[in-house]
Amino acid sequence: MPSAKKTLVNQMDNARHIMLLLVIVFHLFVYNYVLNLERTRCDCSDNWQREFIKYYSLVALVISTSLFITGFSGSNVRLPIAFSLLFSLFGLINAFVIFFYTKNLMDAGSACDCSGGRVRTAIHYLSAFRVILTLFALLSAIFFLVFLRAFV
């Protein structure tokens, strides 16, 4: 029978793989949407935000896929802390950019029919959820740091 520690480590690895898979699916979804806007020459969606979203999603896909594949190979590869923090910061910025980008496209309404549809709406709400989740995690981390410091 495996020890409790080994079981916990396996469960954490499984959760990590599931999270990475969700990140990969989300960024594939976003990257495909942005590429479709470019292919259809949707002028109302053409700005710096679209370029930022496209390139960030591409980088996130490469990094997440690499971590996903190496995780299944048995390697316990982790990103360096500084790079992980930088990637997380840009991830939060990306979530805000996607949220406001899709909000502006939604506000344009019939003036921007080329960007419409359920995909845009889904990306908008997923990015809002991502912002809320990230802010909750940040506030939780600050709370635990303050709480733990009081007991040390």
Where are these regions (language model features)?
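Eukaryotic polytopic
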Residues: P2-V152
